Amino acid sequence: MGIFSIANQHIRFAVKLATAIVLALFVGFHFQLETPRWAVLTAAIVAAGPAFAAGGEPYSGAIRYRGFLRIIGTFIGCIAGLVIIIAMIRAPLLMILVCCIWAGFCTWISSLVRIENSYAWGLAGYTALIIVITIQPEPLLTPQFAVERCSEIVIGIVCAIMADLLFSPRSIKQEVDRELESLLVAQYQLMQLCIKHGDGEVVDKAWGDLVRRTTALQGMRSNLNMESSRWARANRRLKAINTLSLTLITQSCETYLIQNTRPELITDTFREFFDTPVETAQDVHKQLKRLRRVIAWTGERETPVTIYSWVAAATRYQLLKRGVISNTKINATEEEILQGELEVKVESAERHHAMVNFWRTTLSCILGTLFWLWTGWTSGSGVMVMIAVVTSLAMRLPNPRMVAIDFIYGTLAALPLGLLYFLVIIPNTQQSMLLLCISLAVLGFFLGIEVQKRRLGSMGALASTINIIVPDNPMTFHFSQFLDSALGQIVGCVLAFTVILLVRDKSRDRTGRVLLNQFVSAAVSAMTTNVARRKENHLPALYQQLFLLINKFPGDLPKFRLALTMIIAHQRLRDAPIPVNEDLSAFHRQMRRTADHVISARSDDKRRRYFGQLLEELEIYQEKLRIWQAPPQVTEPVHRLAGMLHKYQHALTDS
């Protein structure tokens, strides 16, 4: 496909984006909004953002959800802007400085919350700054400006949603159904690889792919939940399937690791059984039926615990999968599975990264303020706004540098494109509403196609072009104002990019170490006799951390294996029959406190000291288990955990 070619699958969304822009323009002019540009700009960003992220037409519900987040972010930003202005209107410089800190604070929060919800906080940060900068000439009009901005943005969002509904958005349900079938086959094939105990790299690749696919399925569940309330039952089942899929991965990998030391545990019966190849979910269904009969014949005690647990989880997966596909009423058996365990939310390991993002945003906004005051440029306020927008939106993404480059390319492309519209196309519409709508629809259509291709600069070009041509009724043509605005956008993006380059983010290694220590803490916390604590479901949170580790350190297999071993230890100890007595319970609490100290330690020396203390406590704990005559199901996983921590103590403590 050529660089300027148009694929059939891109046309519908391009028409949808053009419709959203035209609707927002028409409504803005009809109700004589003060700045209809904000409505048009909002409609374009809300519609195009999910398409750029998806690399194609977004699924149903994505645009609505993004619009909802934009409304929340705008209202938070407007309220914050009003509070800052009311409190500091007599000190304008201090007021702008506080706004810069507010933008940094919102970026800090957006770096810690779920990536789906971070958009609202990023928006709240620069909305307050926009309000404070815009009302500088007439501060008494602040409430009116805040209300107008909120109204225009809501109108733009409604127009984007109407355009989305008008062109029958894609449902993700069929993709979910197909992935559920395919994922079950992949889980069975992973178990086959682990029982064969072949090449470790092949197994690592297989379980790594399954972790990614399970995480992607969780993202599909979020999309399905946004799509319609009729999928509420499917959503509940998919949430449980996420845990079951992670359980299957854990049991398969533990089966592989067990054979490193005790290969005789996997009998020839099971080796021969898992030799049979499977291609479809129906093949897996038949094999599971046969496997359950084999287990019933051999007995639970003669079946390796990992295979027994794997079959139980796969059977539940199958049952819930059928319910998701049919979306029928939840029966009693399913309800028992769904009423399982409470999921635990883990503390973010990226606090240092979030603080770096805070300083990047705050310093870049302060730099923009100094640039504005030093130059006295009429478009200095535009520079500041662009800096805030770029840093607030870029910092919440994995590669902020590339996002800033995308904005630079977009603003550079917007200059000639905006010139064409401002000097040639729009003047020739001769104040005709129809011709103006057609001209902007053409812009939206072609940029909508480029956005779906994820062309570098396409998203920035769309927003920047609409921003500098300033659609108004009647249109006014002040070329110096246009040029100032266009150059202000470019300078703002360049300054933001400069700050991102200068304020280096060296938090990757620290984040990796914190993640690994959180895995250790989770494994230690599984050693408990507290019934409520044993019922807590840590598995989704642990695999979410593992997925972050994979993204932070692609190709670092030793780290992934260590993390996976800790997850396996956690699951095994969680189900282990630990003797119930006050002596062991008190020691469990002591070990959890020590593990927490390891995570929170700010220096290598303290971390090494607490980690050494944890290793000593594990030795004492093993002696206590012998005194209290704990069964091998307890002593063996504790011994393996202590051995792993001894082996990798330098990786877990040194910066």
Swiss-Prot record:
This is p-hydroxybenzoic acid efflux pump subunit AaeB. Belongs to the aromatic acid exporter ArAE (TC 2.A.85) family. The chain crosses the membrane at residues 13-33, 38-58, 69-89, 93-113, 121-141, 152-172, 370-390, 407-427, 431-451, 482-502. Keywords: Cell inner membrane, Cell membrane, Membrane, Transmembrane, Transmembrane helix, Transport. It is a multi-pass membrane protein. It comes from Shigella dysenteriae serotype 1 (strain Sd197). One of its GO terms (biological process) is carboxylic acid transport. It comes from the Bacteria. One of its GO terms (cellular component) is plasma membrane. One of its GO terms (molecular function) is transmembrane transporter activity. InterPro entries: PHBA_efflux_AaeB/fusaric-R (IPR006726), PHBA_efflux_pump_AaeB (IPR023706). The keyword Nucleus does not apply. It holds the Pfam family FUSC. Forms an efflux pump with AaeA. Could function as a metabolic relief valve, allowing to eliminate certain compounds when they accumulate to high levels in the cell. It is found in: Cell inner membrane.
